[in-house]
């Protein structure tokens, strides 16, 4: 066992003495059992994580029952909804790297034999996922689960995206104060990750098809007894993985990454999943995985389930309609869409895991014969603004919009753009360009949910587009193109767009171009000032120095002269 490094031999007597002091060693025989880390992320200010201490207790009990010795530790967490629209959002994406580094540190310092990861919200799940393939210790994931959808006084289903869009409607005078306050009070009625197909739930669903979580992980409600049963079930599977020495890199292969994107396409997941899954591929040592490959997957995978914010259906609706397993079963039966014979943490293949799944509500999950669209709900766009690519959730765009051509109105920050939208400087026919908000420029690639929500809230969702080197919340909908790469701070051509330039977003052809010649763009480049970091001290300064653009997953890259 790995843990023998800290508990066997005369030299480890001091370590054993300290282990006895933890109270986790109940009998001398416990030193002969596998040591299992519980990587938890309990935190009071994140509603998706307030109940995780209780879930960790369930995991501890089950691990002991299955023959292991549990040791819990915690990582940090950032609530993107609370951090939205101010400097706090600059810390959200960077927190992914802190979480990965923290988990790696504890796991490798103490030589655990297995790891039970309990994430839930936006950057916590991918951060832990990066740690799992980096440490490559037998591991399983079981998230905290989604919250219930809210209900307005008028009987309308609510999610957090409803409130963000209500801000624009209230400011515009099209929503009463009474209705506005009703939404605020009732949109988030329980603990759990926000109720729509936003980033947290998208990632927790992808964990099922990646093979790192048991079926039901993505959709079983946080407040349900079934969530606790999933925790127990996962603990027993983990002990089996430890016994058989099945590791994350045995499960997360190039085929698994392909299949994660396939599920993403079928359920119209958050564009943030692209960022995190590319980072995962890099961390797992999977080479030559680029955005063009994702478009190839989109062409063969139909869009089967349209969930909030793209519809009124919540994650609980998806669960009752058959869950992720029902969607995956459609992809298995489609043939050629995914690789169904890969191993998973259950010890079974993807095909075996979903063999008995079925669609219980064809309004929520469409059968493969009747998809929302024959192609997936996410697209990667390329062109002279985004030579390395950009991402759009086409499932969140009104179907009547196939090609959007408009006049650029440029901003060098999120706040400038929000002010212009709110004071009606932005008008019908504009393409809002927000740059210097990428991983390096932000820093931290902050989400642009406030401007997109204001656009939709004002009723301009089909008439105004927004493009950015920043990213979007999973709650974003409308003509919103993010992750433009290279970013402006890295010299990307989005920095060369001027007010009044004509920009064309062509969804069928997956292109994003500005109607300016290469010669003119090069002349503009000569006048472009050198980027200067916005933050000079602390973690964000170090992050700015090392982070790369979105097409890599926004990973940190060690300078080559240090590793050659």
Swiss-Prot record:
InterPro entries: Dihydro-acid_dehy_C, DihydroxyA_deHydtase, DiOHA_6PGluconate_deHydtase_CS, ILV_EDD_C, ILV_EDD_N, IlvD/EDD_N
Family: Belongs to the IlvD/Edd family.
One Gene Ontology term, aspect cellular component: cytosol
E.C. numbers: 4.2.1.9
Positions contributing to Mg(2+) binding: 80, 122-123, 447
Name of the coding gene: ilvD
Superkingdom per UniProt: Bacteria
Pathway: Amino-acid biosynthesis; L-isoleucine biosynthesis; L-isoleucine from 2-oxobutanoate: step 3/4; Amino-acid biosynthesis; L-valine biosynthesis; L-valine from pyruvate: step 3/4
Cofactor note: Binds 1 [2Fe-2S] cluster per subunit. This cluster acts as a Lewis acid cofactor.
Source species: Listeria welshimeri serovar 6b (strain ATCC 35897 / DSM 20650 / CCUG 15529 / CIP 8149 / NCTC 11857 / SLCC 5334 / V8)
Residues modified to N6-carboxylysine: 123
Stated name of the protein: Dihydroxy-acid dehydratase
Sample GO molecular function, one term: 2 iron, 2 sulfur cluster binding
